[in-house]
Amino acid sequence: MGYLVPTVIEQSSRGERAYDIYSRLLKDRIIMLTGPVEDGMANSIIAQLLFLDAQDNTKDIYLYVNTPGGSVSAGLAIVDTMNFIKSDVQTIVMGMAASMGTIIASSGTKGKRFMLPNAEYLIHQPMGGTGQGTQQTDMAIVAEQLLKTRKRLEQILADNSNRSLEQIHKDAERDHWMDAKETLEYGFIDEIMENNSLK
């Protein structure tokens, strides 16, 4: 079932202007990353990051994250763009950052990674499948690629936290859920945000 995107009316000297809520938030350099991470969503997030950086790369961008995760390639495209642009990217986790969402949220500018008190974090190893009727050699290729992907993602998580690569590998073996305090201790965020003190 779909949902209605709210419209915001603004008054100016030239009259009224209606914006959908996401366009209005973009004017304040706020990007909403919500729902599963997939190619279409990633392209939209990347375009918004590039637009805001081109508009003014001296101001922070605020990336609000609430996602169960999703595509590794789409998520890494977002992370690469966050690292590519000059603007600092503040990440604010609300609800949950799970799986690929953890990689994205923890890749915000160090010192500017936040989480709301009741949000959750999940790390685990990447998932993949070969499908029915896959040849044995193809299964071996997929398995090798999954191991390479896992190593790359674990290195990103280690770089974004205060944990060793070995600890990340051990913790990501199975679903590892963390509340805000545990996520702060782990080093994926820099502060638990009790109120909107970003601006």
UniProtKB/Swiss-Prot annotation:
GO molecular function: ATP-dependent peptidase activity; ATPase binding; serine-type endopeptidase activity
Keywords, sorted A to Z: Cytoplasm, Hydrolase, Protease, Serine protease
Record: active site: S99 (nucleophile), H124
Subcellular location: Cytoplasm
Substrates-to-products reaction catalysed: Hydrolysis of proteins to small peptides in the presence of ATP and magnesium. alpha-casein is the usual test substrate. In the absence of ATP, only oligopeptides shorter than five residues are hydrolyzed (such as succinyl-Leu-Tyr-|-NHMec, and Leu-Tyr-Leu-|-Tyr-Trp, in which cleavage of the -Tyr-|-Leu- and -Tyr-|-Trp bonds also occurs)
InterPro entries referenced in this protein's UniProt entry, alphabetically: ClpP (IPR001907), ClpP/crotonase-like_dom_sf (IPR029045), ClpP/TepA (IPR023562), ClpP_His_AS (IPR033135), ClpP_Ser_AS (IPR018215)
Lineage: superkingdom: Bacteria
GO biological processes: protein quality control for misfolded or incompletely synthesized proteins
The EC number(s) this enzyme carries: 3.4.21.92
Annotated GO CC locations: cytoplasm; endopeptidase Clp complex
Biological function: Cleaves peptides in various proteins in a process that requires ATP hydrolysis. Has a chymotrypsin-like activity. Plays a major role in the degradation of misfolded proteins.
Protein family: Belongs to the peptidase S14 family.
PANTHER family reported for this sequence: ATP-DEPENDENT CLP PROTEASE PROTEOLYTIC SUBUNIT (PTHR10381:SF70)
Self-association and partners: Fourteen ClpP subunits assemble into 2 heptameric rings which stack back to back to give a disk-like structure with a central cavity, resembling the structure of eukaryotic proteasomes.
Identification of the protein by name: ATP-dependent Clp protease proteolytic subunit
Gene: clpP
